[in-house]
Amino acid sequence: MKDFIGIYTNAVDPNLCDWIVKFIDQSCFVDVGENDFKETSWRQDKQVLLETFSPIEAKHLQNFVVECLKNYINECAPFISTYTYVSSLSLIQKTKPMQGYHAFHSENTNWQTCARTFAWMVYLNDVEEGGETEFLYQQKKIKPKKGTVVIWPGGFTHSHRGNSPMSDKYIATGWFQPDQGSLREHMFKIS
């Protein structure tokens, strides 16, 4: 893996993917662009923190992602395999056709996000046209396929964006950061 982008197909149980898609379709908690708290003109998607409303399913999802992180570290950087990481949330998103967040960005650009070592994403459905995750410097586009986990470094070297989907796109996303002792219930030892 020369580009440090780990792609793990069929890594998440398709039944869990279907459950999360149904969950977000039936929810009406946060709709970016219509919510006063997050109203923006540059982002249009529906977001829900899975842990808040369904902690059991969130834990199942995290377990699948952690297995992929173990593989990722063994492939890319085995010398950090003894480190302990936390992933404190699973943000699930629904993006309607031609909507989303299309600006290139990275995951650890300010003091609130600087500890994000790795980003992760799970595609919860297949998208036939558009909707790729595009990495700027790697010149790589990843097509959304249900159950696929993608893991990459959180820094500017892996600036990325979501391209406009032509049909509904569902993802779960989050971050791994080094353990600083405050989130023990979300700790994952990688060795």
Go through each PLM region and give its residues.
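Acidic, glycine-rich loop-and-strand cores that form catalytic or ligand-binding grooves
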Residues: 81-84, 90-96
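Short, conserved beta-strand element in jelly-roll/cupin
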Residues: 92-95, 110-129, 176
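Catalytic core of Fe(II)/2-oxoglutarate
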Residues: 116, 129-191
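Glycine-rich, acidic and aromatic/proline-enriched surface loops and short helix-turn segments
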Residues: 26, 123-127, 155
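Extracellular/lumenal carbohydrate-interaction signature centered on repeated Trp-anchored short motifs
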Residues: 84, 111-114, 143
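Non-heme Fe(II)/2-oxoglutarate
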Residues: 1-84, 191
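Cyclophilin-type peptidyl-prolyl cis-trans isomerase
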Residues: 101-109
